[in-house]
């Protein structure tokens, strides 16, 4: 247990000098000694070693506020990486990046600690999965179905509904799935974390969820490591043979925290100012989120898209790791259609006749073809009007507009705002409804009948009321 002294402090990055024969290893945790003076530095502040600069100096990231630090302060090496409590004691609790409780409900009842830096499972331990995970959200189940043990990304710009979609997925899957979930809040609004906690409490599933938060107001060191803390807890449950749900909101903030400290660590920035280690950092996290022969981790990650540009390096790097991508579109949100999922842009490896079955595959593809035809005709309609279209095209446009409205759905978590009760639509009902639409069995119904309903039967009932 060697003791060093702070020699330089630039924001979240702190250089600490140790005796040359007792330098801490990379990723070791260091703790600020209580100096007893009137400094307002955070007591027990933890640092994580990032680089060894030579001459006994190590460069570290402060996992907490560096306010009040000064040169000469004593820092003790723990000789081990950051370790957090894991196991059943974490369920129903809210923790920070270091696994300390922040819900004022006493200490975490767990004897087992695990380092947040772990190796990804070996290739021969991995277990591919083709079982479908029903979400009860029509557009997702139809066009971009999720796999159990798969990885899903919710892509969208600011304010198109990533968090609401994720909350609805948690609401539908965590309740139906009855397994354990881990939620990592990375650099998001504290209010959303609070809403999530109360949502889980009100629906009586709090005892099945472990929550880890490093929110917007916290230093970059916390936001950079909080995803790993949550993942470590999820891995522990997976390794005891369970099927786990792992939610991350938002993976972009993880990248951004890395960008914030990258320049301070002395790295040259790469494209758009991102850290040069972007792909490696993302790979380290994503390769650990995987299913093994022992248990599975199904992960759902919200990904913020800066300026709605999907080619930005951060979302583009995330794309590589996912099985299903749900792309939220501002144009669809502008039409008032929620969830604002773009059915032409969203993809899934599971949308394969050998996985989902021929009927599901054909209905999904026919829905996409109809919507694509409407997209192509939109310019003609804008310039010349509907009257100039051929009868076949008019029919395609009418069907596409009904499909577009039928892809909307009232959410349970949005009941407070919309005033209409949420709907969970089973996969069979979803396929039946869209099959009737593309087969022309609903051509006589008005468009409004399909907006914000659950199953196709509700659309028929709504049509009767509209007449």
Swiss-Prot record:
It is a peripheral membrane protein. GO terms for cellular component: plasma membrane; proton-transporting ATP synthase complex. ATP binds at residues 156-163. GO terms for molecular function: ATP binding; ATP hydrolysis activity; proton-transporting ATP synthase activity, rotational mechanism. Keywords: ATP synthesis, ATP-binding, Cell inner membrane, Cell membrane, CF(1), Hydrogen ion transport, Ion transport, Membrane, Nucleotide-binding, Translocase, Transport. HAMAP family: ATP_synth_beta_bact (MF_01347). Belongs to the ATPase alpha/beta chains family. This is ATP synthase subunit beta. It comes from Cupriavidus necator (strain ATCC 17699 / DSM 428 / KCTC 22496 / NCIMB 10442 / H16 / Stanier 337). The lineage of its organism: Bacteria, Pseudomonadati, Pseudomonadota, Betaproteobacteria, Burkholderiales.
